[in-house]
UniProtKB/Swiss-Prot annotation:
General function of this protein: Required for cytoplasmic pre-assembly of axonemal dyneins, thereby playing a central role in motility in cilia and flagella. Involved in pre-assembly of dynein arm complexes in the cytoplasm before intraflagellar transport loads them for the ciliary compartment.
Modified sites of kind Phosphoserine: 384, 759
Protein name: Protein kintoun
Species of the source: Drosophila willistoni (Fruit fly)
Keyword terms, alphabetized: Cytoplasm, Phosphoprotein
Gene behind this protein: Nop17l
Amino acid sequence: MSGSTASARNKHSKGNLKHNNNKNKNNDEPIDITKDEFERIREALGKEEFRKLFFEYVDEIQDPANRKIYEDEITQLEKERGVEVTFIHPQPGFVVKTSIDGEQKCFINIAGSPEIARPESKLDINPDTGDRGLSWSIPMAQTASRDDCDAKNQQCKVFDVVFHPDALHLGQKNSQFRKCLIDTALDAVEREYEVNLDRTNLKYPKLDYKGIARPTVIRKLSKNPTDEELEPHPLEHSFPTKPTAGEGEPKVLPMKVQKEQPKAPKFTEPKYSIKYSHDVDLSEYTNELDAKLQVTKPRALVVEIELPLLRSTAECELDVTSKSIYLLSERAGAKYRLKLDLPYTVDDKSGRARFDTDKRRLNIHLPVIRSNEPNLRLLSREDSGVELHSNSESPVEEEEDGEDEIEAEEEEEEVKTKVKPTSNPPSFLKSSLHYQLPGKFDCNLLDNCMAFTLHVANVQPDSIEYVQEKRSLHLQFASMGNGYYPTHYAFYVALPAKESQLIIENVEAEAWDNNVILKLDLNKSSESIESYLAGLDDQDLQDYAIHGQFKALKEAPVQEDKPGDIQFKRNDQEPSLEITVSGLNAVEQQEREEGEIEEAEEQQHKKSASKKQRGKRNKKERSLSESACVSLPTSVDSQPMATLKLPQRKQRSFSECHEQQHHHHRGILKRFSRYDGNDSCSSIDDCSSSYPCSVEASRSFGGIPEEDSSLSESCKKTVRFNDHIMKQVFRLDSSILGQRKKNQKRRDCKLRAQQRRLSEGDSADYEESTANKTQYCKYNKKHHHHHDSGLDLTRHNKKRELAEEADNKNSLMFEMDDDDDDEDEDLI
């Protein structure tokens, strides 16, 4: 009996001023009731007799006299067990209002009871500062937490902390002691129930007590033990007592050092949560290449902020940007401040916010900005292998070219409008991005302009931004790589310190396919600049030398040609044309006479050409040069130099010009030398002059009408084009080299078929023309002084060689025309 009594007493002696913890912690658990029990209670409450008995029981319990009898009986029973029981009845004091974990509202009743010990104080020294003061010991008692409703019938929590009435009286007289009582009560609630109270936003409503006062019990061991406890234990003196280890040594207790409590913040950070919102898009569940590119990125962000002490959003300020949310409330008793960084860039213009007055919760819905989603056409694009800057041209109609040029100009204007200088130099480069310097860049100078070429491909025009200063420029842009991952570049350029007078007036930045062109317009000439400074920013600069310096071309003075007079005389009786050229010196006249004699002999030899060569018709067209056209209208009497007899059949005219030593102007008309051994293009004006000019009668090409006396009136400057448009169609699944090989095989097969169809006589003519062609090509490798009309401008006295040369050229001309026609048919 004695052992069980001792264990029972020890069970209730763990604390002097503590109540039953198990009862407190289990108070919030829900009632476990079965369905049958609920049905029986419902049926019983439906009976009038049961309700009458139930109300009588409630009145009996609430009767103070009956409660006094109940407390006396409980005290007597506990005293028999050796435990003193004291019932504490809280007396109203004041109320503190706050919140639990930033979610639920709660009230703390600071009450008084004479059963609680009085507060005690003693003189003490602060170990940190050395100041003398009073150290208070304030006893207290706590009751179990209970649920209640506030003025708006919303659920809340209520806690009771009971002090001695003298402590409450001191709190009314001294504000510091009152604050000490409040801090002690808050610490007790947080320690006992393991919750976090909002100490920043404390309110003091005009209430003495929240709810109905409920008594609590304090249990402690009785000072007068019972008779059973006074009896000695039978085994107590059977064995000697064991001496203690520290017996005889003084006990040294460590000095208690009170840690300074951190200052309470002025604002409380409310509890919040960020939720990702996704829409059900059926296109993301397909097998397309671009179906799941944006699956991991949400459509919107939903931010929920718990504000239990606010009644509406009019009491707070909310600022939302593309990357953050800032909330501030300066209302007394509800001071909140929250600065939240968002994980994604949002559209703050399209967001919406709503405050739930029932739950005291602020809901913010912000749509997420998604980058440009690459479509299936861009993902499936493959490299065609053709360079962007190819010299090959394809025949396109003029209307399509005009439309393309207009679209290109509009795109350039849009790019120029998008590239605007940024007006925030300190934060120009974003700290969250990694920038790198272009691997290769060049600088060229021209008058007062510095042009930089940054060799970076696939630059997005809308990403170009720059900051312009007087003597420096900071540029940044982004390039899209093969994996659709942007690479950011930065380029900082500054003028050298030697050229202190130079200032940047204007800046132009333009993105191309393979590079970025940066143009700086200076206030003075840039010829004296020898180097420049470049790097990622102004802290990382290196000196680079300038290798490319150019000067603007000055207009060359126009040299007036000496006018040469040409006089034409036509004989109607005999088809002949007499040409007289004046303004030549004696040497040039002698050279011209010798050349005309050789040309006359050559014309006589051409009359004996074969009928096959006469029957063929050349489609080429020739016209007089510009210098000859200018000098044709003038006529001065002079001695005739040569007279040429012309046949009445079709004629061909050539302009033979002696090349001068210095020519400063070149015409726009180009010619192809088909009689020379090497392929070259030159201007007709290179050989044109006002002094030597002659007209040769030869076989016509069939396209130019015979010139009469109208030559002396005016000479038209015309350029003729073929009406037939050649076009080539390329298949998407084949390469250009493969089509070229296929066309070459087709031409070879056609050539072999033509050779098989040739007769014996035609084969002989073909072999003879081929031999003449080979012989002429060998001859041209040694002599390169022939004009495109076939005339030899040098003075050769060998008449036989001139005649053979003319035959070879005529035969070669018609063979080349046949080859050109065959190639045209193959292309078509």
